[in-house]
Amino acid sequence: MYFATMRLAPTITLTCLAACALFMPAPASLAQDVPPGINPSFPPYKNVLELFTSQGCDTCPPADHVLAGFADRPNVIAITLPVDIWDYLGWKDTLASDKNSERQRAYAKARGDGAIYTPQVVVNGMIGVNGSNADAIEDALKITDEALRGARIPIRFWYERNTIKIETGDAPAGYHYKDATIWFAVVQKRAEVPIERGDNKGKTLTYTNIVREMLPVGSWNGKAMSLQLARTAIMRPETEAAVVLLQEGKAGPIIGAAWTGLW
């Protein structure tokens, strides 16, 4: 669904929820703490697709299917962020979060185009395209991958008992970053939702890699760093995987990303 008139959202402020309780500095020797069997090197760089979708949007199911295809690629992290912007049409999205809607508005404001619609895929935090158009997503992946070449930051994370450990590398020579945000997202890998009212009434919609919570857990200034999260502070019953994003500002290019399904 598209708005007939695009309007910029109000200024959005995202706060780090109880940041002091969620994370604390890790020792400088964190790289030596990797459990046996885990490769101590950083994983290959990943491209990130964020699909903003809604159960109240009759043009969204094809996009949900397209995202599932991209999620199978080893060099792509594809996540679904259900939004609540169409809840007033008769069906309240059972997976939607107002934080996801805020994130979509923040992207529109950062890009300066005011484009807020569903289904929309934001590619590497830089370009917004129609989520049903696989060719447009492919083109945006190529453009943003090239734009970020040489500028990406190695990042990884792993679980150790009741702790989640995150580690980043240094910025490449010649690049100067300030106030990059480290996001931690908990993910449900799959959900099937029967729709009882609204434009998709009678359908059962399938979703892939649904973000159930996304929190800013730290900031990065271009230097290698590590931090630890209390696992119990962010665990949810439906959590099956997790994603860490390193993003310029809070809605800029995504310069680092990592995924794990071990939860």
Where are these regions (language model features)?
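Bacterial N-terminal signal peptides that target proteins for export
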Residues: 2-16
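Intrinsically disordered, low-complexity segments enriched in proline/serine/threonine
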Residues: 12, 27-29, 63, 218
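Short loop/turn motifs at secondary-structure junctions
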Residues: 13-16, 117, 240
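Bacterial N-terminal signal peptides
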Residues: 13-25
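Active-site-proximal cofactor/substrate-binding loop regions of enzyme domains
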Residues: 29-117
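Short loop/turn motifs enriched for small/polar and acidic residues
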Residues: 81-84, 124, 160
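Short, conserved sequence motifs used for protein processing/export or organelle targeting and
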Residues: 94-114, 126-263
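Ligand-binding face of N-terminal immunoglobulin V-set domains in extracellular IgSF glycoproteins
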Residues: 121
